[in-house]
């Protein structure tokens, strides 16, 4: 019997999170810390802007967010300049190192999946998500 898509989505999500956590642990980064470095690599942001971007990924647990940001500050990876949070020099180096191992991991995860198959899967998931969100209103 085929499992419903929700089963596979939840199973994939849990497996991806576990794999990413293990991958990033080699650099002593949490997934949320990496997400923060990844966002800040694009440009410095105000605390409110950063919160707005990270909320969909992290949820609304303010204490968790504060702890993760405090750890990044404590390790000298992010700094505040002109009321904006930005990567420090060592933060940028850590981001590049993490980006490299995450890319290697992504290649391993998508082994045997063609570019067109991957694009189609993303397209289908996006449309299903939008449909479900519309119907939930």
Give the residues covered by each predicted segment.
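Structural signal for well-ordered, non-membrane alpha-helices
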Residues: 17, 21, 103-106, 110, ...
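N-terminal helix-turn-helix DNA-binding core of bacterial DNA-binding proteins
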Residues: 18-64, 69
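Charged, amphipathic alpha-helical coiled-coil/dimerization segments
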Residues: 70-123
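Conserved N-terminal beta-strand and adjoining loop/helix that marks the start
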Residues: 1-16, 31-39
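C-terminal regulatory/oligomerization modules of transcriptional regulators
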Residues: 45-47, 119-137
């Amino acid at each position: 019997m085929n499992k419903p898509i929700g089963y596979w989505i939840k199973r994939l999500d849990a497996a991806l999170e576990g794999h990413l956590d293990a991958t990033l642990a080699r650099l002593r980064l949490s997934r949320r810390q990496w997400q923060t470095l990844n966002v800040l690599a694009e440009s410095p942001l105000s605390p409110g802007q950063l919160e707005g971007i990270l909320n969909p990924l992290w949820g609304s647990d303010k204490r968790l967010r504060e702890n993760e940001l405090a750890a990044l500050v404590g390790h000298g990876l992010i700094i505040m300049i002109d009321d904006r949070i930005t990567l420090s020099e060592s933060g940028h180096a850590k981001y590049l190192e993490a980006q490299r191992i995450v890319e290697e991991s992504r290649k391993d995860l998508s082994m045997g999946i063609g570019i067109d198959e991957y694009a189609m899967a993303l397209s289908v998931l996006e449309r299903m998500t939008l449909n479900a969100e519309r119907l939930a209103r």
